[in-house]
């Protein structure tokens, strides 16, 4: 019974803390009207777009190198 009380007290304590943290974040978002969130999304989308571009370029170059190597081996010019 003692361990059950202990675990319930721990769950209540953690729930109270998480609820207060959520309330603080909500109040902070209300004060600045979500401007920080928009900046984070803008930066993330910029990084995501750059990563896609780099991946696409690297894959294209790797494909060219692979095709050139295959053509070289097929024609025995290596």
Swiss-Prot record:
Main location: secreted
Expression (tissue specificity): Expressed by the skin glands.
GO biological-process terms attached to the record: defense response to fungus; defense response to Gram-negative bacterium; defense response to Gram-positive bacterium; killing of cells of another organism
Subcellular location field: Secreted
Signal peptide bounds: 1-22
Record has Secreted as a keyword: yes
Its biological purpose: Has antimicrobial activity against Gram-negative bacterium E.coli ATCC 8739 (MIC=12.5 ug), against Gram positive bacteria S.aureus ATCC 6538 (MIC=3.1 ug), methicillin-resistant S.aureus ATCC 43300 (MIC=25 ug), B.subtilis ATCC 6633 (MIC=6.3 ug) and against fungus C.albicans ATCC 90028 (MIC=100 ug).
This protein's name: Esculentin-2ISa
Source organism (scientific name): Odorrana ishikawae (Ishikawa's frog)
């Amino acid at each position: 019974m003692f361990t059950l009380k202990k675990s319930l007290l721990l769950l209540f304590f953690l729930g109270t803390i998480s609820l207060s943290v959520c309330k603080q974040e909500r109040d902070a978002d209300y004060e600045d009207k979500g401007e920080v969130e928009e900046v984070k999304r803008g930066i993330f989308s910029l990084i995501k777009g750059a990563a896609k571009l780099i991946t696409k370029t690297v894959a294209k170059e790797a494909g060219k190198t692979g095709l050139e190597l295959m053509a070289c081996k097929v024609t025995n010019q290596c």
